[in-house]
């Protein structure tokens, strides 16, 4: 595993947010149904990645105390994100169930809080991708990074509308999207180097990363995909994402 590969993957994960923002510029108006289906598919991929690529390896690497390390890591990761959520609410908690309602008030301060929240939440997601590389399983790490990147595309699409409605210029809007993506790049590098330097923490770190991903899926992604009347489609999309990740894991494993 080379640092160059980790860096390129980190740039890809962070760049997915920018790609989503550019899509929103190109297509102007993206339907809730489309974004919900894409986000649900990403949730399925991330769910499988969290279990297959992070939590199960944590049990394996932990040896005799694997179960203790894994359970402790999962809850620690979830509680850390829960604490961040209390300090800086994210996605559906700021935007609300209806994005148009948010766009209509044009509150710049609320928009900036929204973008800051996404940036802060991107850090642990980046760390999760980096930790997976630290395990040494390149195929698993790439699948996990791919799932996180896929989730970043609709997130990047969500950033643009409220900022433009609040009067922020297109150039500054794109710069904000780039900043949120950069945070994820930094998080990926932090996660990778942390477990590379201190390999003893790998079982706990893997479970911690898995816990953060499970929290994001349950607390943010699934509620967001069910907020606009596309619950059935989102559910099947999540299952499709999960099964695709499962098939990929078996074929590449």
Task: Briefly describe each language-model feature range.
Residues 1-253:
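Intrinsically disordered, metal-sensing/regulatory segments
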